[in-house]
């Protein structure tokens, strides 16, 4: 079975948010269309506590229960089967969806007999990359849907693509899904 994983498509990572990815909102319609092609759609959220050490390196963003931590308003959340919260502890950065603290993502995927993970979301060179690397390490076939991800810095995005390719992550267009 295959699953679509939507990484951190939250208000604070979209234009106008506290840690916005330029044009991050452009992934939303692509992701909404992709959802129709999957039986299983999962999502991750950054969900930081006020005193998180994560904010030593980043502006405050995605504070738990805040408007900034909510999914982008145009994202079709009715199609999302489960949400995995990450970065929930004071000393937890939580870049990868596999670092979720409310549920074990790998265990959940294995129980659902998922072998292929298609990843979408924000930001390519941070949470998308770390999620893809962890998924590959855990033995899943990993695909990044190119039109369904967005990053902050083009050079860093290219370096992230190379790092992901080195561990077998594949890149596909939305049409190929």
Q: Where is each model-derived feature located?
A:
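A short glycine-rich beta-strand->turn/loop micro-motif centered on a GG-aromatic cluster
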Residues: 118-121, 140-154
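Short glycine-rich phosphate-binding loop at a beta-alpha junction
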Residues: 41-43, 114-120
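Short active-site-adjacent structural elements
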Residues: 126-130, 151-154
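Active-site acidic carboxylates
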Residues: 1-90, 106, 141, 152-177
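Alpha-helical scaffold elements lining the catalytic groove of polysaccharide deacetylases
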Residues: 90-112
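Cofactor-binding loop segments of dinucleotide-utilizing enzymes, especially the Rossmann-like FAD-
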Residues: 7, 46, 122-124, 147
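Histidine-anchored nucleotide/phosphate-binding helix
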Residues: 31-34, 129-137
